[in-house]
C-alpha cells in the first residue's frame, strides 16, 4: 500500500468541465546554478538534520560540502543516511524519532525524490507526533508546518519536482 502524504495545503480551481490549474503559488525561494549549495551557510538556526539516500551525495562530495556549510552557519549537524528507493513507513517513522530526539531547526533533504519525500513525511511527524499516515492522506486537512523546523530540499535529479510540492509518496511494505 502506498500513502500519498499531503504536508501542506494547495489551492486549485476547476474550469469549465476541464481540470485547469489557474494558479500555482510557490512562496519559497529557489536557488539554482553554480554556488547555490553555498547558500546553506546563510541559514539561521542551531541544529540541522541532513536526510540522504543511498550514497551518491557522499561519493560525489556534496554531503560533506553541505555539512560543512551548515557548520559554517553555526549549526550542529546530524546525518540521517540510507533512505531507500520508494521510502517505507518504517524509514519515515525512524527518521521522525531521530528528529524528535535531536530537535533540529532545519531539515535538509539531499538527493533524488526518495530522500526528499521521506524527509517531508518525517517533518510532518516531527512537528505533529500524534498524527497518523491516514490523517496525512486527507486533502487540505493538515495544520501548518514550520512551527519546529524549516525545510530545505537539494534535488540531485529531475523528476516529479518533489522539492516544490506538498506531497510525499511513502510505501507500506507490510
Regions from the language model: what does each represent?
Residues 28, 128-174:
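A glycine/threonine-rich phosphate-anchoring loop and its flanking beta-alpha core
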Residues 104-120, 156-162:
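Glycine/serine-rich anion-binding loops at beta->alpha junctions
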Residues 78, 108, 150-154:
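Hydrophobic/aromatic beta-strand patches that form the interior of the parallel beta-sheet core
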Residues 66-69, 124-126, 169-170:
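Glycine-rich, phosphate-binding/catalytic loops in enzymes
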Residues 97-114, 142-147:
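Short, charge-rich binding segments
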Residues 96, 115-128, 164-165:
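Short Gly/Thr/Asp-enriched flexible loops that form oxyanion-binding sites at enzyme active sites
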Residues 5-106:
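ATP/NTP phosphate-donor binding region
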Amino acid at each position: 500500500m502506498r500513502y500519498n502524504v499531503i504536508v501542506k495545503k494547495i489551492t486549485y480551481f476547476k474550469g469549465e468541465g476541464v481540470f485547469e490549474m489557474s494558479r500555482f503559488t510557490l512562496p519559497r525561494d529557489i536557488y539554482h546554478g553554480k554556488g547555490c549549495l553555498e547558500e546553506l551557510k546563510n541559514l539561521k538556526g542551531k541544529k540541522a538534520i541532513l536526510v540522504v539516500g543511498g550514497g551518491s551525495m557522499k561519493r560525489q562530495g556534496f554531503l560533506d560540502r553541505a555539512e560543512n556549510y551548515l557548520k559554517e552557519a553555526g549549526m550542529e549537524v546530524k546525518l540521517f543516511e540510507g533512505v531507500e528507493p520508494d521510502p517505507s513507513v518504517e524509514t519515515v517513522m525512524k527518521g521522525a524519532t531521530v528528529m524528535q530526539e535531536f530537535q533540529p531547526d532545519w531539515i535538509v533533504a539531499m538527493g533524488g525524490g526518495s530522500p526528499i519525500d521521506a524527509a517531508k513525511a518525517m517533518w510532518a511527524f516531527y512537528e505533529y507526533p500524534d498524527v497518523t499516515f491516514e490523517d496525512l492522506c486527507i486533502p487540505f486537512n493538515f495544520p501548518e508546518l514550520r512551527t519546529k523546523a524549516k525545510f530545505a530540499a537539494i534535488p540531485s535529479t529531475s523528476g516529479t519536482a518533489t522539492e516544490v510540492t506538498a506531497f510525499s509518496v511513502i510505501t507500506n511494505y507490510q
